[in-house]
Each structure stands twice: as C-alpha cells, then as structure tokens.
Amino acid sequence: MSTGILKVQGDQVVGNDSKPVVLRGAALGGWMNMENFITGYPAQESQHRASMLKVLGQKKYDFFFDKFLTYFFTESDAKFFSSKGLNCLRLPFNYHHFEDDMNPRVLMESGFKHLDRVVDLCAKHNIYTILDLHALPGGQNPDWHSDNVTNYASFWDHKDFQDRVVWLWCEIAKRYKDNAWVAGYNLINEPCDPKHYRLPQFYDRIEKEVRAIDSDHILWLDGNTFAMEWRDFEHVLPNTVYGLHDYSMMGFPKGNKYEGTSEQKQQLESQFLRKAEFMSHHSTPIWNGEFGPVYANPQLDAGHEEVNAARIDLLDQQLTNYDKYRIHWSIWLYKDVGLQGMIHTDPASKWMKTISPFLVKKRFLQLDAWGRYPSKQVEDVINPLVEFIDKHIPQSKEQYPTPWATERQVIRMINQMWMANCLSDEFAGLFKDMSFDELDECAKSFHFDNCLQRDRLNRVLEAHAAPPDAAEGWQRPKSETNGHTAVRQELP
C-alpha cells in the first residue's frame, strides 16, 4: 500500500511515515516514446509514424497504434514486474501525444488514455511510476530518442519551445497532483545544452511553475550532457532528486569484454562516483535513471551465450555498486524486440516474422546508434572520411556533445538520420495491405503472454531489487569536488 505522496528528506526519499523508500525498477521505453532499436523501425518516431500513416491510411493507422499501446503494457506485465520485487516503473512519453505542433498549447486529452491506464495498473500492483518527458518540442538533445530528426537540439535556442514544455508539465501536474502512486516528474530526459548554464536556469523556472500547481510531488532532474554532467549547477532545488545515467561501454558490441578484473570493477565504480559527485557534494538522494547492457542475438551472433553471460556479469557488478551506496535505479529497459529488454518479442511472432529481414539490413547499414555492430563495408566508407576530417579540422573532436568523437557525429548525420529516413517508407511498406486482424496480430506480438523472458537478467534484477538495510553498513559517496567534473568519455 502507498505511504502517501513521496518526498525528499535529506538524502532519502520517504513516505508520510518518514520511513525511507528506495525506488528500483525499469523504464517502459518504446511505448509512448518509440525508439528505433526497441521496436525495429528505422530513423525517428515522427518519421516512422508519417510513413506508417502514408501506407496504412488513417483508420488502420489509428487502429494499429492504439492496439500497440494497449498490448505493450497490460495487467500481466504489472504482475510480472511486481513479482520480481521491483517497485517503480519509469514512463517515457513524447510530447506529441499531448500537443500538436500546428496547434500548440491545446491539450490533447487522448494522450492520457494509456498513461492513466498504466499508472493505475501499476498502482494496483504496488508499483510507483515516474513520469518522464522523453521528447521535447525542438529536441532537448541531438539524438533519436528525443524524436529529433536533426542533430540540432533547438529547444535551448527557442523560448517558445521552453514555454510549451512549462505549459505541458503544468497540465500534467494538474492531473496527477493528488496521485500518491506517481513518484514524481522527470522533467527532461538526457538534456544536452551546449552552453550548460541554460539547463539549471530552466530547471529554476519550471520548478516554480510546477510547484505553484503541485507543491508535493518530487521532481526528478537529469544532469546535462545525457545526464552525466553538472557544470553550472550551483544549488539544489527543494524536494528534488537529481539523476545520472550510467551506461558502460563494456556492455556494448564496440566495447571491451567484461571479465570481472579488479581494474574493470574499479572503472565501473569510479565512473558512477564521478557522475554522482554533484549529489554527493550536496547530500541529496541519488537516482540512476538509465543503465544496462545490450545482448547478442542468438540467431545472428556466434558465441552469443558467452557474450551475454559477460554482459549480465557486468550488470550484476553495477548493481552491487548501487547496493553499496543504496541508490535508486531504473534499468533501461523493460520490453523490446530482443536487444536489451527484460522481456522481448518471440522470433516466431507475426511482428518479428514481418520485420526480421529488415532488422538484418539495419544492422548491416548501422542505422541504429544503440547496440551498433561493426560493419566492415560501412566502416571502409566512413573511416577515411573521419580521418580526413580529424586531420584537416582537428576542432571536430571538440564539438558538443563532448563525449562524441568525430565518427559518432558523422554516423549520426549520415547513417542514422539521412540513410535511415530514406528507408522509413520501405519499413512501413512491410505492413501494406495487411487487414485489421493482421495488424492486430502484429501489435499483439508485444503482449506479455506472447513475449519471452530474459531469465538470468530478471533473476539478477530480482536479487538486487530490495536495497540493503541501513544497518548493513551501506555507504554514502564521498565528494572531493563541487560536483562539476567535465565529461570526456565515449557513450555507447
């Protein structure tokens, strides 16, 4: 049962009884904020939806996406999630569900249909939810997961985009201000402000506006540069939890294999502690809002069992570190087509049979950033260009986001934006002339009853779901700086 609306008390999150509540769970990525690697399409969500509308027509388009949103999370999912001891589901959503760019500041009530449903399902099974605005008008970062069809995060340069986000969060706060199972509002996912100071200034502004409507719920605020950097953050806001994201390159195809060496374990802990310096310095709660490896494909990857065992060992060590410091965490992610989720679609399902050949093509062309596999033919084309740029324009290595090398910038603009969008219609064409029943079967591929579970991953999560008791000697990270250490490492 709920202990009332959660709040921040010192470095803890507590209920009305002042007893600590540690939130641990996963994110429902790919649902109300779709992502290419999660469900299989190329490019960005808005481009995917435009192509699907072109191919299906309005009636079939509306039917399919409503069924998709319905089947993606049902009571069966809530029961399973709760059975693993997990108590918090992060709910990423795209602003497009609530506002039309051609009719701004007019609330689309339809956006709450599925958000309300899942919040209520989670509450029924004693699961808190964190509402996460994952895609903002103009794009808060240059990546696909903000539904940004460019590599320019224009949100930071246009006050009107910022005004619209303040307006939207105020509307959301009106709806959920009395809901004790909503753990709070994650106002911006992975912001990337090249000037740094505008993000904390915007947080100061929106905090006042939201608090005027809902003075009780916690605000969950990501750091800058994909939730890894705290430059120009000079103070903390009341009743606020600050969030980092803690992915490790060792969990991805282009990273080194995790072998459990003392050096690798130290690297994992040091990486986390650097990102947590700001929270440690200010003695606030610590939330790791995203982390987790991707997994090799049994149908495509030789040695997949060994690879996946090492990836889960890596995850287990990260969770051990988080237990040591008794932090809140939300793994990325709950459900997908087989790359990263706790559960995933069955290769024999209608959806997977329809798109599997296209997934092989995407992988070969490196159209998805997440879980990008080596592709010699692509790299033979791209690498000489990258070397040429680095030789003649060495400043290219210093462009923001600073964790991106030149190769990442080039691949993003050529492969993952332009080439991927060129194939949006081809992907949508896979569903051309499907009947309503066939579209329903495709959408139902994501229903819990039709999905497969990643058993060892789920056992590891269950083992770490309950935080260590305070009496067991958990530690508070020590801060030796003001929390402003710069980020210079590569992202997955």
Predicted features and spans:
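N-terminal structural segment of carbohydrate-active enzymes
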Residues: 1-97, 105
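Active-site region of glycoside hydrolase catalytic domains
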Residues: 2-9, 15, 22, 26, ...
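An active-site-proximal structural segment forming one wall of the substrate-binding cleft
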Residues: 6-7, 60-89, 99, 103-139, ...
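Substrate-binding cleft of secreted/luminal carbohydrate-active enzymes
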Residues: 24, 269-405, 409-423, 428-430
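Aromatic- and acidic-residue-enriched segments that line the glycan-binding/catalytic groove
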Residues: 35-46, 105-110, 137-159, 237-239, ...
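Residue-level preference for long, well-ordered alpha-helices that form the structural scaffold
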Residues: 48, 70, 104-111, 154-165, ...
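Short, basic, glycine/proline-bearing loop/turn elements
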Residues: 61-63, 257-262, 302-303
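Short, solvent-exposed turn/loop segments enriched in Gly/Ser/Thr/Pro and often Arg
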Residues: 92-95, 133-141, 223-225, 332-339
